[in-house]
């Protein structure tokens, strides 16, 4: 993309991903950088402009390196307050908090095509503006939620472009194109053509192994590699024994049959369960599974010395969650021989790319599944008997969701097996069996989701079926914990 892009600087919070995706949806390429970056890194990246977001509730100062680069800067939310204070403004306290007000935009290239609208403000502070800055918008009460140094092209808005917000989309587009001079050229089709060329140049006449799970990310990446180098890529599927009901067979059938890709399948169920014996803590579970998985990939790599490259289906959210550009890879492979073709794509972009590559519709709609699999949905020690209960309960819940047509409203829905045993009754006999928890969410971003408001009669049917058809579970609950306090997964 050369330097025709906007750098999104994350000061903390979920907004960086949301704003970056909004710009990409308008075909402007973006990259995200975490707070703490130095001026030299900014200069190496050489973006056309910098969007600084987040910082609400965080104590980190505004990065002066962003101001020193000499390119346009747009700061949103808490970052706007940090920027103006860094430039010498004096705070006059909070003027508005958690309320809506009408906003009028003054003549400014950032607000071309806009005049006034109603907007929700989480917080608006008053400032005695420093030299060079002027107010560029006012609320109905006469407050200034936006200001700018037009000569230095520094803009601060104490609000965000919210969901389904046409004015916010216009502001971001104006910043990218009219102020920064970016061109809206980012599309999945252009990415596909460019990445195929890059892979062919990088791999040359070599061959590659690629770890696949059957999910959207790794399958799309495998199809991309196959488009680039054909039969010289071999997929490696490790059946950890921690997949949902019927998934291992589905993965093998899809890759070898429907997609016609070369596949090495490794049955590692017993091996993984042996390593997990006695492990209860979630962090330790993840570490054990990761270590064993990487050992298996390294073994496959040693058995295929002709494969010079190792490929992973890492996507952008994986990269951001790690806080590093270094991805995991099989230890036999030198880092210079590692490929992550879709590492700069968000999940929705991966799905679009998959469709271009012929990804089966059923796979394109497949919900996200954690890397450690059912181990993180099985509370306490993971055993084969507990996994069997969880698989059956999960399959019933997913079937009821789909029969009720609720799957189109949700991004993830699954069962969790609690380690608690409760008193119940089965065939007139008192029992002590496991409790099962159902979870359904609609994700809106990297750290934001809504709890699925499922019809009560559907939940009743699912609960009744699970208790009746899965001996070993005698109690079913539905988790409605909000994202402000919990994660989607329990572990």
Regions found by a protein language model. Name each.
Residues 322-323:
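Short, solvent-exposed loop/turn and secondary-structure capping segments
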Residues 316-318, 444:
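Short loop/turn segments at secondary-structure transitions that flank enzyme active sites
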Residues 1-52, 56-62, 67-69, 85-308, ...:
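RNA-binding accessory domains that recognize and position tRNA/RNA substrates
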Residues 312-314:
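Extended catalytic-interface subdomain
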Residues 75, 79, 84:
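Gly/Ala-rich beta-loop-alpha elbow adjacent to hydrolase catalytic centers
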């Amino acid at each position: 993309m050369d330097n025709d892009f906007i750098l999104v600087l994350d000061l903390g919070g979920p907004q960086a991903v949301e704003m970056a995706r909004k710009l990409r949806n308008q075909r402007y390429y973006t990259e995200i950088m975490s707070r703490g970056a130095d001026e030299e890194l900014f200069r190496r990246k050489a973006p056309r402009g910098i969007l600084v977001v987040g910082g609400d509730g965080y104590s980190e100062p505004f990065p002066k390196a962003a101001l020193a680069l000499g390119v346009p800067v747009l700061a949103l939310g808490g970052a706007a307050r940090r920027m103006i204070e860094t430039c010498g403004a004096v705070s006059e306290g909070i003027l508005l908090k958690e309320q809506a007000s009408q906003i009028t935009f003054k003549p400014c290239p950032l607000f071309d095509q806009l005049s006034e609208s109603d907007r929700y403000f989480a917080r608006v502070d008053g400032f005695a503006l420093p030299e060079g800055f002027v107010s560029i918008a006012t609320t109905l009460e006469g407050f200034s939620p936006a200001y700018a140094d037009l000569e230095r092209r520094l803009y601060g808005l104490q609000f965000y472009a919210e969901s389904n917000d046409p004015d916010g989309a216009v502001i971001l587009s104006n910043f990218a194109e009219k102020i920064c001079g970016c061109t809206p050229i980012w599309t999945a089709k252009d990415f596909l053509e460019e990445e195929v060329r890059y892979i062919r140049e990088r791999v040359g006449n070599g061959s590659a192994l690629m770890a696949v799970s059957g999910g959207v990310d790794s399958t799309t990446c495998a199809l991309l590699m196959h488009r680039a180098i054909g039969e010289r890529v071999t997929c490696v599927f490790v059946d950890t024994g921690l997949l949902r009901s019927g998934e291992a067979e589905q993965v093998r059938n899809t890759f070898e049959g429907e997609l016609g890709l070369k596949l090495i399948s490794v049955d590692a169920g017993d091996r993984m369960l042996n390593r997990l014996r006695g492990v209860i803590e979630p962090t330790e579970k993840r570490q054990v599974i990761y270590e064993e998985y990487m050992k298996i990939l390294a073994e496959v790599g040693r058995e295929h010395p002709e494969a010079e490259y190792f490929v992973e289906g890492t996507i952008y959210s994986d990269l951001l969650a790690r806080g590093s550009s270094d991805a995991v890879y099989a230890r036999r492979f030198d880092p210079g021989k590692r490929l992550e073709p879709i590492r700069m794509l968000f999940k929705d972009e991966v799905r679009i790319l998959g469709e271009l590559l012929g990804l089966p519709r059923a796979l394109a709609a497949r919900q996200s599944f954690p890397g450690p699999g059912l181990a993180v949905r099985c509370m306490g020690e993971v055993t084969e008997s507990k996994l069997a209960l969880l698989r059956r309960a999960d399959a019933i819940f997913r079937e009821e969701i789909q029969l009720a047509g609720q799957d189109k409203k949700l991004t993830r829905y699954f069962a969790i097996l609690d380690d608690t045993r409760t008193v119940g009754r089965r065939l007139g006999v008192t029992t002590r069996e496991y409790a099962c928890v159902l979870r359904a969410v609609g994700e809106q971003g990297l750290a934001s989701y809504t709890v699925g408001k499922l019809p009560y009669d559907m939940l009743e049917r699912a609960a009744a079926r699970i208790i009746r058809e899965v001996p070993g579970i005698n109690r079913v609950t539905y988790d409605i914990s909000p994202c402000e306090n919990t994660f989607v997964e329990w572990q």
